[in-house]
Amino acid sequence: MKPSIHSLTHQTMQEWVLEQGEKKFRADQIWEWLYRKRVQSFEEMTNLSKDLIAKLNDQFVVNPLKQRIVQESADGTVKYLFELPDGMLIETVLMRQHYGLSVCVTTQVGCNIGCTFCASGLIKKQRDLNNGEIVAQIMLVQKYFDERGQDERVSHIVVMGIGEPFDNYNNVLNFFRTINDDKGMAIGARHITVSTLGLAHKIRDFADEGVQVNLAVSLHAPNNELRSSIMKINRAFPIEKLFAAIEYYIETTNRRVTFEYIMLNEVNDGVEQALELAELLKNIKKLSYVNLISYNPVSEHDQYSRSPKERVLAFYDTLKKKGGNCVVRQEHGTDIDAACGQLRSNTMKRDRQKAVAAVNP
């Protein structure tokens, strides 16, 4: 199975062309064809020699993903189900924001973290995506608009799809390098956000990288007992260890951390929890920001329901009165398979049912 050409960073592209006996500037030409002109085949790279095109075809594919399903919401959200070369499925989501087009990418096939409210963890991790498969998600979303003649460009990226990005650390870093490169898509690092469920040691590593990509942490509870009950990762990285890493990140980078907090009715959404959260954040409140997120129900997790508006507002008001920076996040795609991993999970379920029906007509 040939890798995607998108697996090469600009530096490794330069190394590759030199290994082929070509001049270094050929890497810039290939890069421009891929990311500025966004061609779908090597044959379209008309300023390359036939010999170099043959070598590219022999060693790489341009697009490693196949589009299976596209769901479009009334609010402009678009959800894509892509098939990988090995037949596995991943999701990507485009969201229209007031500041531009934001794409949420997947970094793993399945997830081993096992959050009890999440559709992504219904299917255990099968493998990591390589950086080319992550880059290809952005390129196919951009292609979706290019083909419709819509003069719109992906401007922001959130690494919050299926999987734990910091469990696929090196591929995710190479994805940042490729998509941020000023000769390519040139998406600014500060327009990219990576979200972790709380791998404390990787947060420290990320602080030391010196990249300008934004950091978000999926917190979802203000104390160890509650967080461990809904996120098993808290047993390995309890809040004390997690916040020591977050404080190290802030001290090292002087950059703000966003905390994601999904609102689960009568589980973590009470005024008591809001007060606990305010206390937890009191030493870093100038460089912290809380996103209060409405829960998208998942049939397999029917013990949870979304918090009613009055509980969300009471939580928000309590946190604000304590000096916390917070916002109730805008919802997207509520009329389609909105929850992370839901489209993939539902499609796999239907595929299994069809397979059983074919065997037992």
From Swiss-Prot:
Localization of this protein: Cytoplasm
Cysteines engaged in disulfide bonds, as pairs: 104-340
Annotated cofactor note: Binds 1 [4Fe-4S] cluster. The cluster is coordinated with 3 cysteines and an exchangeable S-adenosyl-L-methionine.
InterPro entries: Aldolase_TIM, Methyltransferase_A, RlmN_N, RNA_MTrfase_RlmN, rRNA_lsu_MTrfase_RlmN/Cfr, rSAM
PROSITE patterns in the cross-refs: RADICAL_SAM
Provenance organism: Streptococcus pneumoniae (strain Hungary19A-6)
Catalytic activity as recorded in UniProt: adenosine(2503) in 23S rRNA + 2 reduced [2Fe-2S]-[ferredoxin] + 2 S-adenosyl-L-methionine = 2-methyladenosine(2503) in 23S rRNA + 5'-deoxyadenosine + L-methionine + 2 oxidized [2Fe-2S]-[ferredoxin] + S-adenosyl-L-homocysteine; adenosine(37) in tRNA + 2 reduced [2Fe-2S]-[ferredoxin] + 2 S-adenosyl-L-methionine = 2-methyladenosine(37) in tRNA + 5'-deoxyadenosine + L-methionine + 2 oxidized [2Fe-2S]-[ferredoxin] + S-adenosyl-L-homocysteine
Protein name: Probable dual-specificity RNA methyltransferase RlmN
Domain Radical SAM core: 97-329
Active-site residue list: 91 (proton acceptor), 340 (s-methylcysteine intermediate)
Function: Specifically methylates position 2 of adenine 2503 in 23S rRNA and position 2 of adenine 37 in tRNAs.
HAMAP family: RNA_methyltr_RlmN (MF_01849)
